[in-house]
């Protein structure tokens, strides 16, 4: 910002004349910005980066902001406190909690079903243009209100006092931390005095909502400017007090807590105590307490750096103290004051609630508990915080009484100005006042659509500017799991099993996305009768996850889990009239094989939703032909470490998936370099989970290969589509050649009509390598002839075995239970490498 450029407008610093010109077109600016939706996830990322900068004293921006605040007249202690409070409020955890508490979701703008059994969609959408008339005595309030407006997706114009630039600088820096540019186009900061009514009138005329702070007269003046239909969010004057019973008012700790609350922010906060009430009828107890409090307050003020009141504020303090001293002659009051006027304790034997002149001036009054309602209820519209000093039993009784009389918050002495993430403000949730709840009630054409946004386009969520983390280095992402509450272990099919960390919010959110994916795949929560046959136990998440997915869908579920007695499971399917199965392909095939007679005769199973491994096409054909199964689709594409990643719709080919674009960002990168793979080419899948709380998952290389699919899907969704093309582990080096497990599977299916398990075993002896291909079937079944078929149909294998003589190749047939599987999930291990260098 250069000299004369005093205002911040959508990413630019402008002067008075330009601001005047743009104000005439404010509605046009707002309309253009609102046409490009802003996800709360984008705001979260930018705020978290800014919070990190504010906690670093060496950060250049933090240094500039500190200097600016001191130049604006803020005391050193207040500067430090303000920056600390702002950093805490902008942290990812604080804002995530706020969104969940106030709007019920971390991305509340999704127009999604609240009940997955009905075609009814709801979302929290922005009011539109939100004007914030910020107070001059609290530097952070305006900026934090704008951030709440951004979380709701609004275009925000904040009016600050004419001289101070804290809000300008902080919000401009926030916009700089956003890679998309969407935040900048939703922020305007104008610094001008309240006497400039023409600008304020223009702002209010264009506004869809106005948030205002100030006294009654100021709020009334703004209300007169607000047009019909515009929402006025009134953060008007509030009054807070402490209330002490006899067993608390003699405690030095309680008095020290009250003194600390009086001194914090020079008593400028709405939650600062202006009165201390005592639960007594005795005048002497009031006067004695005031004397003790004065001594403690004097010590607290001496240890702080109090700001000096303005000329008008000093005049109000002087007038109040003078009148109170005069009333001493009537036996009504007693004044205790510092010689330099830095603090005042004003004892008053009348119970009526009244505001103090602030700047460490506090009333002490009697208020017997039986009179709480009588005295406080007439002032109910002004009451905010009560610092309750009482026994455990009395606290419960008295808290109920003051809340019934109109108070909004009850805390303890010393904590009156403290808060917690997601706390209501003045009895309401701010985010709900900055948003509007909308709904769409549709029909059966949308039976498989969980979110209407997917029919419009994908969320524009960019990956963070960090290095890629390979799957083998997953533990690097677990440097901070302090928020983790739930742990699951991977099945181990792609390496050593490892624990993944989640919060409960992560878990429930992932299950919601999983349920949306199953709905898109064709599951009918109102009509289908499902049996969950995934593996469970040993920290494995398969069974438990799909139990919760079906719970989210509120579907009929029989949670059988995978059992060793496949025939028993088949009988249970028939007995309980199950028509839909969830499980892993190899396990489900064993159930159909061993329960073939019952299942074929019953013919009730119509849908299969699978996960964990590939379902060969030949085996799908067998199930459709022999058992009448109509739908066989992936229940979800995901992993224990990364969560849900993609889903299939009714038009998806076998390996094709839509991206969960509101949850993940996918990059498909070149096989050798960290750059995007060429169009249509196979690349490495790298995911960023934007809402993960238990551990961050930024640019994580999952270990799978795939390619982007071009064109729009016939299902109508506009979310990105990709095709899975195997795993890194499917490609292995043997006999100096790179071979692919998927090629062995393809040859088995196409040339041998094989629809059982396929496994590659690698070992070595006497310096030579051996590759054994294990096929499910009767032992010794034409192994040599089958080996020749593979050599004929797989040229790279033939080169290694026949031409170069570097590899021995054998085929063996084995029973189903001879195949090596992961201990936790029972998933088939595609490649088992026993070579010495891999042990």
Where are the predicted features?
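Active-site glycine/GP-rich loop and adjacent strand/helix microenvironment
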Residues: 1-36, 41, 45, 202-204, ...
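Short, well-ordered beta-strand segments
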Residues: 131, 528-533, 686, 774
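Rossmann-like NAD(P) dinucleotide-binding subdomain of oxidoreductase/dehydrogenase enzymes
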Residues: 110-263
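Nucleotide 5′-phosphate-binding alpha/beta core
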Residues: 1-130, 436-489, 495-521, 525-527, ...
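AMP-binding/adenylate-forming
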Residues: 504-516, 520, 529-589
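Nucleotide donor/acceptor-binding cores
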Residues: 128, 527-528, 606, 683
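Short, compositionally biased "basic patch" segments
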Residues: 335-349, 478-497, 510, 515-519, ...
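Hydrophobic alpha-helical segments in the ANL/AMP-binding
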Residues: 87, 141-151, 171-172, 519, ...
